[in-house]
Each structure stands twice: as C-alpha cells, then as structure tokens.
C-alpha cells in the first residue's frame, strides 16, 4: 500500500464510557485532532521514555488557567519533564495559587472600564482582584530581600530559591501541589526565563535594585546551562545507548527560541559537534508564513542546526489552543507512560558547566593550534588582510 495511506478511517459511534486513550486513538482521525493524536503517540512511545532528556518551553497565559498545577506539575513529578523554559509571567501567576489567592472563571464579554473601576484584572475570561497582584508583589519583594538572593545568579537558581519559598508558603497554608514552582523545586527541575525583565517578577527585581539590592540575573549563565543540558543529553543512563534530546513547545515566542538555540550555541558558537534536537513537538496557533519564530516549522529549524535532519519524522506541530491540547496530552501520557526516575538536572548544573567549559577551551586550543600549523605550512600570503571568522574560529566563506 502507498505510504500516503496510514490507516483506513472506520468511524463508529462513541460509547458513553470511553477512556481518554480510546478517544484519542480511535476518534482523533484528521486535521489537527490527528496531529494531536500523533503528538500523544510520539510522547508516549518515544519521547517520555528512558534515555531522553525532555525540555519544555511555556508561553502564553497558561498558569492563570490552572494548567501549571493540573497538567504540568504531574508530568514533572512523574519525571517526564526534565527542564523548563517559561515566560516570567507564567511563573508570577503560578505564585497566586501557591499563596492561596483566588482567580475566577468568567467570560470575555465584560466591561473593562467597569473592571478597572472595581479594581479587577482580566486575562481574557479569567477575573481576579487587583489585590492579588499587590499581595503577590509584596511576597516577592519580601522574599527577594533575603540574604540568599543578594548576589549574581542565573534564573534557574533564582526560580529554585523562589520555589523553596513558594513551597514554604504551601506548607504554612496546609496546601500541597498548588504551584509549578514549588513542584520543580522539590523535583530538582531547573526553570529558566529567557527574558527575566519581561514580567511582574522582573519588575519587582528592578524595584529592589533601586533600594540597593545586590541581586543580578545573569543571562549568560542561562545560555550556557541550557546548552550544557542539551549537550550532555547524549550521555544516556542506559548502558550502550546514546541519549536523545526532545523539545516540547507549548505556544512559541522567546521560550521556544531559548529552548531551540541550545543547539546553535553548541555547534555554531562553542565549536562542539552536535546534530540538533532529536524530537520537536509544538502546540501553537501561530502561522509559519509570517516569518515569526512562533510559527516556524521543524524543517526550518533544521537549516539552523536546531533539529536533527534525520529526526524530521519525529516532529509534529498541532495548530490549536494550548488550553485544549495540554490537558488531553497530559492525561494520555500519564495513562500510557511509567514514571521515570527524576534526573534532578538542577543539582547537576555545576558539573555540566565545568565539563562544557573544559570541552570548549579544548576545542578553542585545537582550532588555534591547527590554524597556526596551517599558517606555518602555507606560503607567505600576498595580502595581510585579516580573515573574518565565527566565534568558534571557523572562517566565514567569502568574508575578509
């Protein structure tokens, strides 16, 4: 049979006692429902298996909906997500739940002027009091004045410390499993923010800087740590089996790029051998034809070295609302996958960075030695014009 045909569509009535697995396997037959089925199958059968390091990027207002707690935290506790790159806004709104604050389901057709007069905030069809922001801000500022925050650090360490305080707030309120930050802290899952100033957390960090706070969030640490995680994903815990790297992308935006740029950072900038992520899975509503990164497809990422060209068959993009897809794929995966041992990548960061630095400096020394040897063996050049090179030392073709 032609490879164009996957399986025959054989519709049957949906029974009244159907499970989520049967619903997806047998009734998500075409269009984006079929893409969502393919994502569920790829996650369950290949991605969330031993030997694969799974990075999640998170954009859009996901945590205000409760999905940080209901859909993502269970995946973290099951060892199915190893590191996260999120907008700061998602982590800020996650704190509302850790602090026991109330958000309400409403509808989008409300009078926003009246909401402003009543000191209420709207995120599409979610409504909450302005005091939720003020009390969360007060919590953040109180926490960030503590001694552990008075130094330079990356956002993984910053969010780990913040998660520790969020967990303490949960305990004080007699709550559990009410915060993605607290869950990541407990499970040793590092959380990065690609643009830490672009959120209310970053705004409060900036305010404290005016008071003389010594806290500085260093993006260079984040770039190198995430690159190290992606690079050492090749080291599998399974004997005689090479590890793999997966990118699970919810939405798009800056977190998507920060997750994918780990690969160019390795081969383009650091000059180390790398082939790209092995798996690429995205839930998005962004179109590819406008040129934005949010809608860029996996095959385009191949041209940048972000995705392994041999792994294109293991890439899926589903064009739908993430609040529809995320609960479905979480339910499917938790049903079909056994929990994995926690990698606790947060604790392994220093060792990975030390080894990445050693390999980078070794590669630099080798390139410089080869360049020197080549120069000694070459006849005296007629021109002394400098040759333009990439940071890793590779000459740029056609450039002087």
From Swiss-Prot:
It comes from Cyanothece sp. (strain PCC 7425 / ATCC 29141). Belongs to the deoxyhypusine synthase family. GO terms for molecular function: deoxyhypusine synthase activity. Pfam families: DS. Keywords: Transferase. InterPro entries: Deoxyhypusine_synthase, Deoxyhypusine_synthase-like, Deoxyhypusine_synthase_sf, DHS-like_NAD/FAD-binding_dom. Signal peptide: none annotated. One of its GO terms (cellular component) is cytoplasm. Its EC number is 2.5.-.-. This is Deoxyhypusine synthase-like protein. The lineage of its organism: Bacteria, Bacillati, Cyanobacteriota, Cyanophyceae, Gomontiellales. Residues 372-400 are annotated as: Disordered.
């Amino acid at each position: 049979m032609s490879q164009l045909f996957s399986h025959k569509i054989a519709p049957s009535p949906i029974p009244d006692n159907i499970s989520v697995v049967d619903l997806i396997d047998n009734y998500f037959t075409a269009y984006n429902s079929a893409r969502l089925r393919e994502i569920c199958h790829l996650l369950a059968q290949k991605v969330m298996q031993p030997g694969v390091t799974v990075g999640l990027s998170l954009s859009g207002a996901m945590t205000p909906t409760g999905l940080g707690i209901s859909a993502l935290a269970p995946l973290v506790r099951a060892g199915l997500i190893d590191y996260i790159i999120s907008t700061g806004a998602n982590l800020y709104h996650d704190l509302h739940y850790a602090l026991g604050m109330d958000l309400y389901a409403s509808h989008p057709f409300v009078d926003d002027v009246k909401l402003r007069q009543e000191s209420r905030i709207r995120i599409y069809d979610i409504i909450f009091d302005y005091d939720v922001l003020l009390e969360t801000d007060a919590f953040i500022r109180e926490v960030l004045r503590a001694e552990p925050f008075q130094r330079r650090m990356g956002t993984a360490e910053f969010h780990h410390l913040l998660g520790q305080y969020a967990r303490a707030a949960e305990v004080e309120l007699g709550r559990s499993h009410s915060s993605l930050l607290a869950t990541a802290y407990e499970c040793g899952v590092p959380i990065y923010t690609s643009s830490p100033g672009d959120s209310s957390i970053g705004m409060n960090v900036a305010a404290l800087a005016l008071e003389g706070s010594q806290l500085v969030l260093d993006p260079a640490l984040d770039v190198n740590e995430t690159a190290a995680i992606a690079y050492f994903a090749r080291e599998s815990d399974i004997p005689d089996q090479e590890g793999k790297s997966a990118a699970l992308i919810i939405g798009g935006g800056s977190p998507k790029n920060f997750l994918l740029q780990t690969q160019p950072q390795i081969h383009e900038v650091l000059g180390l051998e790398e082939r790209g992520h092995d798996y690429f899975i995205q839930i998005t509503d962004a179109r590819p034809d406008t040129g934005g990164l949010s809608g860029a497809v996996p095959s385009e990422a191949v041209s940048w070295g972000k995705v392994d060209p041999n792994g294109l068959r293991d890439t899926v993009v589903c064009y739908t609302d993430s609040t529809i897809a995320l609960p479905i794929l979480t339910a499917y995966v938790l049903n079909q996958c056994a929990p994995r041992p926690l990698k606790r990548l947060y604790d392994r960061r220093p060792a990975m960075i030390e080894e990445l630095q050693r390999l980078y400096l070794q590669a630099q020394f080798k390139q410089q030695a080869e360049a020197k040897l080549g120069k000694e063996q070459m006849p005296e050049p007629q021109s002394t014009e400098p040759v333009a090179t990439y940071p890793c030392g590779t000459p740029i073709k056609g450039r002087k």
